[in-house]
Amino acid sequence: MVLTGEIHHTVIIDGIRIGPYVCLIARTVKHVIGWEWVPYESSQYWSQLIEILPAPTYVVCDGQKGMLLALTTLWPETILQRCRFHAWLNVKTKLTLHPESIAGRQLLALTRELLQVHRKREARIWKHRLKYWYRKHSSYINQRTIYPNPIKGQRKWHYTHYRTRSAYRQLYKLRDDLLRSSYRPHPSLPRNTNFLEGGINSPLRTLIKNHRGMSYEHQMKLIEQYLYSRTEVAKI
């Protein structure tokens, strides 16, 4: 890892799995600035990478739980921009592309609109539309299925439409972050991690695919060489 101590305006972070390991990567829109090998993503392991980097003004990420905890603990003043594309993928996975319910179809359409939000006014409108969706479908997503519990005198329950409810909860958590970051005061602030996904992770996956016969240790060294080649120091 190459550390320069430079304070960056925007940092994009994400993780990529290589066999039994995960490579946590931090970069700007131009350069890789740090990486860390860990067994899995958690607040502890994300902290190992984040704590050695100066806090930026903005950070763009996919909102993984452990990552968020590390960010809010170590970079409390940094403005968080969650990746909307990840939100879209997660909601699409929960609802599918062809939801059976009206609530699901409307929520999927609302998630598509999220990708086109660029300004605070648009964000406020989107937030109000999400609020209206909940008012209209709250009884549906809060519906419970109750079934007998083997323990006498008790009953168990679960949300009947838990996938739709889970998709809504994800968008609900995103709404305030959307307002903070929709008006981008600086052109270097991206709305998603595509700089990392396409510019770094995609070539890494191709690199590993072309060297599948290597041991994981050799693959890791190959990845580190590639990441170093994308640092500012290597490009000087």
Feature annotation, model-predicted:
Residues 17, 89, 200-201:
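Short hydrophobic/aromatic residue motifs in ordered secondary structure
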Residues 58-61, 68, 109-236:
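Acidic/histidine-rich catalytic cores and adjacent linkers
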Residues 62-65, 69-111:
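Conserved beta-strand -> loop -> alpha-helix junction used to position metal-binding or nucleic-acid-contacting
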Residues 1-77, 174:
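RNase H-like nuclease fold core
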Residues 22, 70, 94, 205-206:
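Short, function-defining helix-loop hinge/capping sites that tune catalysis or transport
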Residues 35, 87, 212-213:
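A generic structural signal for short coil/turn motifs at secondary-structure boundaries
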